[in-house]
């Protein structure tokens, strides 16, 4: 799988791409990640990429010329399954969306910055808009990393335990169950006996009940959504 990421602060990605899961995936040859500096396509001597908004108001807006030039140059080299803009008013990033995107080959991510991007970019170039929540950040770099991490961990061969990602929270519409490890008794707090029994069927029943209970308490909206989809 390949990611091409467009950003006005490309150095933001340096430490993350040389450590952790994304670095492991790259070393295994499962993922390619390329960061492109939008300023390389900027205008004039100072490589300008932003300007004041028509109509006045606070903040700056990313100009269309650099973005069109960058994306068109990349599209001339390969086909992208999706050109994604990270924005607060996009489709909410949830597990089913990450699952779908993990089956694609080439994704192009545009990180917003400043107040906004020129609307003509969204109308003509962007095929998908994704939000990580109802909150405004200083740029799309953190959402881009979140999106890549959510996708990459689903690619077969990336995680040491291939089933780990398939049993995470949200994969079946529920939060994950509670987990315990050694010691079995810590300061009088004991691990549930069923988890020590070795009886796998009983363990799975306990985990299902635990997942349902945690979801009911912490995210009842997930149960309501599942009920609506069922009926």
Swiss-Prot record:
Pfam families: tRNA_m1G_MT
Any GO BP annotation: tRNA N1-guanine methylation
Keyword Zinc-finger: no
Keyword annotations: Cytoplasm, Methyltransferase, S-adenosyl-L-methionine, Transferase, tRNA processing
Reaction equation(s) it catalyzes: guanosine(37) in tRNA + S-adenosyl-L-methionine = N(1)-methylguanosine(37) in tRNA + S-adenosyl-L-homocysteine + H(+)
Record function comment: Specifically methylates guanosine-37 in various tRNAs.
Membership in a protein family: Belongs to the RNA methyltransferase TrmD family.
Subunit relationships: Homodimer.
PANTHER family, sorted: TRNA (GUANINE-N(1)-)-METHYLTRANSFERASE
NCBIfam families: PRK00026.1 (NF000648), trmD (TIGR00088)
Protein's UniProt name: tRNA (guanine-N(1)-)-methyltransferase
The gene coding this protein: trmD
């Amino acid at each position: 799988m390949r990611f091409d990421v467009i950003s006005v602060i490309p150095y933001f990605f340096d430490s993350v791409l040389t450590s952790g899961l994304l670095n492991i995936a790259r070393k295994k040859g499962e993922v390619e990640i390329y960061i492109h500096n939008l300023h390389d396509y900027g205008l004039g001597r100072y490589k300008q990429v932003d300007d004041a908004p028509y109509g006045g108001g606070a903040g700056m807006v990313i100009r269309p010329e650099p973005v069109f030039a960058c994306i068109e140059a990349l599209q001339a080299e390969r086909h992208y399954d999706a050109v994604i803009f990270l924005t607060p008013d996009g489709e909410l990033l949830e597990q089913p969306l990450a699952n779908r995107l993990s089956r694609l080959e080439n994704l192009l991510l545009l990180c917003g910055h400043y107040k906004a991007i020129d609307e003509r970019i969204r109308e003509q170039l962007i095929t998908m808009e994704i939000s990580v929540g109802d909150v405004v950040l200083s740029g799309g770099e953190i959402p881009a990393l979140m999106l890549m991490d959510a996708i990459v961990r689903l690619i077969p061969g990336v995680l040491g335990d291939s089933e780990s990602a398939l049993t995470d929270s949200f994969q079946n519409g529920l939060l994950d169950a509670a987990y315990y490890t050694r010691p079995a008794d810590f300061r009088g707090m004991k691990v549930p006996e069923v988890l020590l029994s070795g009886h796998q069927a009983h363990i799975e029943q306990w985990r299902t009940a635990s997942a349902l209970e945690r979801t009911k308490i912490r995210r009842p909206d997930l149960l309501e959504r599942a009920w609506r989809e069922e009926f």
